[in-house]
Swiss-Prot record:
It comes from Shewanella pealeana (strain ATCC 700345 / ANG-SQ1). Coiled coil: none annotated. Keywords: 2Fe-2S, Cytoplasm, Iron, Iron-sulfur, Metal-binding, Oxidoreductase. This is Hydroxylamine reductase. It catalyses: A + NH4(+) + H2O = hydroxylamine + AH2 + H(+).
Length: 554
């Protein structure tokens, strides 16, 4: 086992990365190794998909499958070995299908088929033990003794960034947003990563290419969500429980939430969002359901306590899932799509009757809590509508600075930094937030500036797209570069979606971003130095020092 993809990975003087019998996320060494093998075979599939495109062959079923299966290897997504093996054997079948189609087309065109890389050639073993032995050649730091650590760091930066982009591609696909061009570029990058390049410049440029690709994917996802559910509107949301039977929906998938709302109409079941599903309550086509009563709980890392005390059924539509046996709720949590946990019921198709039956069999909340309201829904359309007023307040001096404080949440004590920087930001500043990092402060009161709320909740992590659109609008209004705006980005990272959002911002030329609470363990000191020199990227330090620096306080 070797895994270094998330913030909680092991860091020791001897080296970084989880390499024992179990990762810090709870992933077993077998699961980790099987995921590595899956990625390796997927790189072979993408290699053939890229070659097939050169001779005019596009297989949309495979274009859909590869990002989805890749998504299953993100942090806290799928811990079910049998599901991972099934993805891997299906990937080999697809690879062989593309191989046959490509070679037949080359023969038809009387041209030579191009040479195969290693992931295109591996023949899977027939059993789990055989596959585990094959995983040794698929480990993400393969060749570490022969290549410089900076090359390995760049490979991992690209691999984990592309994982994040794959997740957003799958979220977009669920909402009928696909692109042959995006899929083609994705396959090209996957194929390149399967070649284990030692070209530092090419790897760095590929990381920027992944960021650019993800910008297009986030635009597709934005289009899919707004087309299906309308543009988010500023909306007050109750964060307390309501008497009645209950279903809790966590993850990121708005479509699954809509299906659950449709199927629970008139059944006396209240539906709650959790974690990154909170922004759903601002979409007109979702909040129209009266039994979507509010948001329960907070960010992913608190689920073992929050799900244990939730008296209803729970649905995980995407990341992040952690061991449901700890809170003894494994018999009432359900997984969807790419999510998996051994022994937990997995919902296939669009029928949530098992979830509904479980909710009906449970007690539910026995009384109404006193409501506590927070305001959400300041996504792209709402921000653009407010832009003229915001610009007036900037010109008048009422608003002097913007902070974007968001990203992933986690349980490290150092993450209190993000609460403190939001609460200690000057009263003449506006704080934008997104992702589950918002839970560090989104229930606090920040007041307003001439009617403009000082805290603007943009949405999910992918709604960084909305923040980018606001920054572009402001830079155009003030006729300046984005980096000349009174805007400070403070990003909390935990996993691969945050990595690709960071790559997106860097690829767009956004500079002077602060990230924390720690730097990714796969980034070597040399790579961190390059990113600081090129983009001004730096780690958070102390709230006082960082605020003084960005506000130019002596």
């Amino acid at each position: 086992m070797f895994c270094i993809q998330c913030e909680q990975t092991i860091r020791t003087p001897a080296g970084n990365g989880c390499s024992y019998t179990q990762g810090m996320c709870g992933k077993s060494s077998d699961t980790s190794d099987l995921q590595d093998l899956l990625i390796y075979i997927l790189q072979g599939v993408s290699s053939y998909a890229a070659l097939a495109r050169e001779v005019g062959i596009i297989d949309h079923e495979i274009d859909t499958f590869v990002p989805k299966a890749f998504f299953a290897t993100l942090t806290n997504v799928n811990f079910d070995d049998e599901r991972i093996i099934a993805y891997t054997t299906q990937a080999e079948t697809f690879r062989n299908r593309l191989k046959a189609a490509y070679e037949a087309k080359c023969s038809e065109l009387n041209i030579d088929a191009k040479p195969m890389n290693a992931p295109m050639q591996l023949v899977l073993g027939a059993s789990k033990p055989e596959m585990l032995s094959q995983a040794l050649q698929a480990v993400p730091n393969r060749g570490k003794d022969e290549v410089h650590e900076d090359i390995m760091g760049l490979r991992l930066l690209c691999l984990y960034g592309l994982k994040g982009a794959a997740a957003y591609m799958e979220h977009a696909r669920v909402l009928d947003q696909t692109s042959d061009e995006v899929a083609g570029e994705f396959h090209e990058i996957m194929a390149f990563l399967g070649e284990d390049s030692v070209d530092a410049d090419k790897l760095f440029n590929t990381a920027m290419q992944i960021g650019q690709l993800n910008y297009r994917v986030m635009a597709m996802l934005d289009e899919g969500e707004t087309h299906a559910f309308g543009h988010p509107e500023p909306t007050q949301v109750n964060t307390k429980s309501v008497k009645g039977k209950a279903i809790l929906v966590s993850g990121h998938d708005m479509k699954d939430l809509e299906l659950i709302l449709e199927q629970t109409q008139g059944k006396g079941i209240n539906v709650y969002t959790h974690g990154e599903m909170l922004p759903a309550l601002a979409y007109p086509e979702l909040k129209k359901y009266p039994h979507l009563v509010g948001n329960y709980g907070s960010a992913w890392q608190n689920q073992q306590k929050e799900f244990a005390t939730f008296p209803g059924a729970v649905v995980m539509t995407s990341n992040c899932i952690i061991d449901p046996n700890v809170g003894d709720y494994s018999n009432r949590i359900f997984t969807r799509s790419i999510v998996g946990w051994p022994g937990v019921t997995h919902i296939i198709g669009d029928d949530f009757s098992e979830v509904i039956a479980k909710a009906e069999s449970l007690e539910g909340f026995i009384y109404d809590e006193i409501p506590h309201l927070i305001t959400i829904g300041f996504a792209r359309n709402a921000l653009m509508a407010a832009a003229p007023t915001v610009i007036e307040n900037v010109k008048s001096g009422a608003i002097k600075h913007f902070f974007l404080v968001g990203g992933c949440d986690g349980d490290k004590q150092e993450r209190g930094y993000f609460t403190d920087i939001a609460t200690q930001a000057p009263a003449d500043s506006v704080i934008l937030t997104l992702g589950c990092g918002k839970y560090k402060f989104n229930k606090l009161e920040f007041g307003d500036i001439n009617g403009i709320p000082r805290l603007l909740d943009i949405g999910q992590c992918n709604d960084a797209y909305s923040a980018i659109q606001l920054a572009i609008a402001l830079s155009e209004a003030f006729e300046c570069d984005i980096n000349e705006l009174p805007l400070t980005l403070v990003l909390s990272w935990f996993e691969q979606k945050a990595i690709v959002v960071l790559l997106t911002l860097l690829s767009l030329g956004v500079k002077n971003i602060m990230t924390g609470p720690t730097a990714p363990a796969f980034l070597t000191p040399n790579l961190a130095k390059v990113l600081e020199e090129k983009f001004g990227l730096r780690n958070t330090t102390t709230v006082e020092a960082d605020l003084n620096r960005v506000l130019n306080v002596a």
